[in-house]
Amino acid sequence: MVIRSEIVSIGDELLKGQRVNTNASFIASALSDIGIPVVRVVACGDAEEEIMSALRESLERADIVLVTGGLGPTRDDRTLKAAAGLLQRDLKLSPAAFDALQEWFVSRGRKMPEAMRDQARIIEGSLLVPNTTGTAAGMIADAGERFMNHTLVLMPGVPSEMKAMMNQTVIPYFATSSKMVIRHTPVRTLGIGETLLAELVVEVEDHMPEGTTLAYLPHTAGVDLMVSTIGSSVEAVERDNRGVVDALLARTGRYVYATEDVTIEETVGRLLAQRGMTIAVAESCTGGLLASRLTDIAGSSRYFLEGVVVYSNKAKEHFLGVKFETLQLYGAVSPEVAAEMAEGCLFVSGADIAVSTTGIAGPSNESEDKPVGMLCLGVARKEPGGEVSVSTRTLFYHGTREQNKLRFSQAALCEVWESLQDR
C-alpha cells in the first residue's frame, strides 16, 4: 500500500505573498525520493483555529502530515499549542531538547531567556526531532485512534532548520517504513512547445504501465518531461521507467538533449570537451548572458575561448569586421549581420565554432517587419577540410525583456548543440 502524505505550511506571510513556499517543494521532493507521494499542500494563516482546522482535515486524509512554521518564540507562533489541543495532549519539556537549547546559547556567549524554555516543549508521547541549526524543537507524533494513528510531524518554518531536520531525522525515520521504490527520469527538451510535445507523446501516455506517470514541466527556457514510476520491486520499477523513457525518445529524440538533471550549457560543454573543440560567442541582444551561461560550468576553460558584446553597429564593425554596407542594407537585426558576426568571431578568436546573437529583446525599438522578440542567430564553424561553414536562423518569441534574453540565449545554445550532433 502506498503511504500518502500532505504538507501544511503555516504563516500569514505565505498567504500575503511575502514569502515563497520553498519548504513545501523541498519536502515533496525528499519524500518522493523514498517512495512517499505528497497528495496535497495546504497553506494557512497563524490563527490558532485555522491551524487546528487545517491539521484536522489533513490528518483525516493522509497517513503522514508534515507541518512547517509557527514553532518560534513569538506571539504569532501558535502551531504547537494548536496541534497539542487537536490531539488532546499536554506539552512536556524535553530534557534532550532543553539541554541542546542551553548549549545553543552558551556556545554563542549568551544567557538563555526564561521565555525560551517553551522552545524545548514537545507534545506528550511524541518523538523529538532535534534542531541542530536553531532553537525550536521538532517532533513526530502518533495522532492516535481518532485520526487512525496517522503521523504528525512538526518542524520550524526556517528553511535551513527544516532541511536539517528532514535530512537528519525525518527522512531516515520514514525511509524504513516505506516499502515502495520510486524512480524519476527527466527528459529535457528544447526547440519545441508544450502543445506540440504533448501531441507527439500522446500515444505513450495512453499506454503507460500502472504506477508510471508523466508530468510536463514547462519553464522559460524549454519544456521538461518527468517520468515517475513507483512500485514494490526495484527491477520492475527500473524496467517500466526505462521503457517509457525509450518510447518518449523514439518520438521526441530530435528535441531531447538529456535524460538526466543537466542544463543545455552543461550538455554543450560536454560535447565540446569530448570532441576537443573550442567555442567563442559574439553577442548583441543577449548582452553577455550566453557567455555567462557557458562559463558558469566548472572546467569551461577547456573549451570556451572568448566572448564579445557588440551592442552598437560601430562595435560590430570594429571588433568583428561586420561590413558597413551589410548593416545599412539589412539592419543590425538580420540573418546577414548574424552570419558576419559569427564568421568574424570565428576568425578573431581562432575557435572551432562561433555563435552570434542579434535581436530585439524589447519592450521598444520594434518596427513593422522586425517585432519585439525577433532573434537572428549565426553559427560559424571550421569544417574538417579547412573551409568555414556559416548557418543562420531567425526565430520569434513573446515575453518580457528578461524572458526574451533568456530564451535567446537558450536558442543559441540549442543551435550550437544541433551543430555538434553531426561531429
From Swiss-Prot:
Transmembrane segments: none annotated. CDD domains: cinA. Pfam families: CinA (PF02464), CinA_KH (PF18146), MoCF_biosynth (PF00994). Signal peptide: none annotated. Belongs to the CinA family. This is CinA-like protein. The lineage of its organism: Bacteria, Pseudomonadati, Chlorobiota, Chlorobiia, Chlorobiales.
